[in-house]
Structure formats: structure tokens, C-alpha cells
Amino acid sequence: MLRTGWAGNMYVVSSVAHPASVRAAHPARVGSWLARWWPLVAVTALAAALRLSTLNLQSFWFDEAFTPLHVLHPSLWATLRTVSHTENTPPLWYVLAWADSRVLGTGEIALRLPSALAGIATVPVAWAIGHEFAGRRAALVCASLVAVNPLFVWFSQEARAYALFVLTAALAMLCLLRAEREPTRGRMAAFALTGSLALLTHYFAAFLIIPMVLWLACEPRVRRAALPAIGALVLVGAALLPLISAQQGGNGTQWIGKWPLWERLQAIPQYYLTGYSGGELGHRIELLVALPILAGLGLGLRRMLERPHPKARRGVLMAVAIAAGGILIPIVLVPLGADYLAPRNLVAAMVPVTAVIAVVVVWPGTGRTGIALAAAIALAFTAISIDVDLTPRLQRSNWRGLAKALRGGPRERVITTPELGSAPLRYYLPELGSHNLQAGSSVLVSEIDETGVRESAAELYEPFRASAGEPPAPGFHLLARMEVGALAVYRFVSPVPRMVSEATLRRHVITLAGPRSKVLVEAGSQESP
């Protein structure tokens, strides 16, 4: 539509968009946006469904229950002080958990929600990483695998720092890629910030940051611009050293060295293929999941040799370097006396692993075969993630269900449990006292409940004693034996309250945990030294 008229001594002819054409352009822009981004929206929605729909399906385990019982306090300062004495993790996640608990409380959904949101947010970050490497196809595959991988889903439903660790490390990797491509001051600052957040979330972030820093330092084109960012990361790492030293006084990592190294090394690929609890599925399922990955990598590597793609190849090398640092450095440190190699601590290194798989499997020239193999990997991951929700033996031990079975007992009662059952039982049974029965003391009780784990990960629980089910003290008889998933409880009762010593209770605890077992006392029980 034309508009004409005089402006001063000039006659002006101008073009004005017709309102109808403006209205027509708006749907076109929306349609263009949807066509471009609907795959990412769909994959992110799938990630949200897998994480949020069953957020409180599983019981808290020891570490999750320990946080609201002993770490979180009304005061943030008191919480941080407790972190320095009882935890083996930097403080960032606990600051978020403290803020979350002030608003939403300390229930399962409330404390797990930050992890779920972090897991969901990692999906678009994975998309961006894949896009930086090799375009939209690699972006879609990378985001899809992160969305449905059972290991990432598991830690997105755990009230611990791991999901936030994955997110911050993935953000640091993305910022590294963009800073390396265009080394502006702002992009280097973003890399320094996200890398610092990763270090403040989990100490194992250092093993991922080291190869990132070395990559920038060895690249003449960006070295000078990267120096301030590298310096900032070094300062943050140095600032954490006093906290690391203070936390070494605890015993939170002693269990790692008791887990045979070979079993831990085997668990690293198993965790990625079938999830944290996927060992229960057996090696056949691991092989079935690994087959499309290996086939896709083989096909993609062949096409890489036939059709070189310098940018994508450089991205693959960078991702391999980051993943290698995150996995191999902790392994190398084991024979040097620094054995902190728990497979769960390597979870963030699985993001660059996923990026490598995504880029190589759909490398240019792999065609429909590459797409089919990528879809097969995603479907296998999805099936296992759903299977965890449907199969109790793949879930965390059901201390919530066991506590429900124990409710309504007499006030004169003690409960014996493996060490890893003490915090969950106290969380779900608030009537239990806040302390264990001390060595050399006795307690007047009419019921003794002995709990244990029938079957679970060997590195976490001990087997039952052969004498399990026999009365632990004179005058008591077996009232009932109950099973809740992999957990079992023997309930022994006496017609009248009897004084029972701590030594007697510990001798007859149904697991072979010895000193690591706990004797929990009901708040109404009478103790004597």
C-alpha cells in the first residue's frame, strides 16, 4: 500500500505494509520457529516426563536422607559449616538445597526437584554442543541421548550434586567450544564462570577442566585471550583447597577403596550403557545396548576417513580429550595413593562421551543407517529408563516401605540396621531418637527389630548372618519376618520390657557389617550406661 503527501517542499511517496500482510507474516514466523525448534522442544519434554513423573517413586537412600537430617539447618552459615565437616563435595549444591528447603521443605520431591531441573536443562545444552560440533543432526542425537540415558535420568532423580555437576560441566564445555571458535572477552568470561561453577559443584570437575584449559593454552590463536579465564579457574581451584583439607577428616570416601578396582573399572561402561542399577540386568543387556553404539562408531569412523570434515573432526578430538581427562586422570591417580575412583563421580564425563557418539554415528555419509543406529541407541536407553520405574530390584532400596512396615510399634523398641539404613530410617521414622545406642550401654525394650538387605550391590551392603531369625536376647521370640523389595526385617518381641545390652544387640545383628551396623533407639526407650 502506497502513502503520498507533501513534506515541506518535497512530495513523498512511501510504502506502508498492509495490516493483513503483517498478520500473515506473524504465523509464518511462528511456523518457521516451530519447524526449526520443535525437535529440541520434543526431546526436552521427553526428558522432563522421564524425570518429573516419577520423582518420588523411589525412597531416599542414605546420602539423600542424611542431608535433611544432619546437613541442612535453618541458618545457611550453619549448613555450610556442616558441609565442611560431614561432606566430600563443594558447597554450591548445598546452597541451592538450603534455599530450596526454605521454600518447599525437605520432602522427596522438594529436595530432588533441583536435580530434576538441572537434568532437564542439560538437554538443550547437549543440543548446543552437538550443533557446535557438526550441525543439527548431531545436535538432535546428542540431546536425545542425554535426555533418555538411564544414568543421567537416575541422577536427575537424586537429591545430590551429580545432576548439577553434569549441567555445569556441560555448560563449561559449550562455553569452551564457543570461546575457542571466537575468543572474545565475553566468551572467555563465560567459560571462566561456568568452569568455576562446575568446580564449586564437584571436585571431579577439575579432571574435565584440566584438558579444557590445556586445549586453550596450546592453541596459539586463543592463548593470549584465554589467560584471564585460565587464571580465574586456577584461583577458584586454589580457594577450594582449604575446604578439601577440612573434609579429608571424615570417612565419606573410605568405602571406595574397599570396592575392588577391577569391579569399579567394569562399572564405568556399565553405568553408561544400562544405568546406575543396570548391573542387575546382566552382561547380555549391556552387550545389546553396546552393539548399535559400536556399529555406529565403526560406520562413522569409516566415513570420517572417506569424507574428512575438519571442523567436526576437530570437535570430536576435543570431546575425546575432555572425556579422557575426566575418566583417565582419576584412574591414574589410584596407584599414586589418591583413590577416589567411584564410577558415579565420572558421570559428567559421559556428556563428552555422548557428544562423540552423536557426531560420529551420524557423520556425513552414514545416511539412513546412521540415523537408524542412533534411534536404536536412544530406544535402548529409553527402555532401560522406563524399566527402572517398573522394576523394584532396579530401584534404590525401599527404606520408606520398610519404615511404613515398622510404624505402630511400641515406644520401648530398638532397631538394628546396616549403616546405610540408619539415615533413611530416621528420616522416615521421626520418632526414633537422634542418636545410636552407645557402646557399653543398655536399653529397656519390649521389641527388637533387625533390618538388613537380602540382595544388593556388594560394595554397599553385607550379607545376612547364618543365624538370622534367631532371638537376639533371652525372653524374646520371633513375631514376624517381612520383606520389602530387597530389604527384610525380623521383629522380635517380649511380653514384658527387658534390659538388653548394646553388645548383645550388635552380636546378633542380622548382617555381617560388624562395627558399621547401627542400633537405633526409639525415643521413649529407657537407656542406662
Language-model features, listed with the residues they occupy:
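Membrane-proximal helix-loop-helix interfaces that form the catalytic/acceptor-binding platform
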Residues: 12-15, 35-528
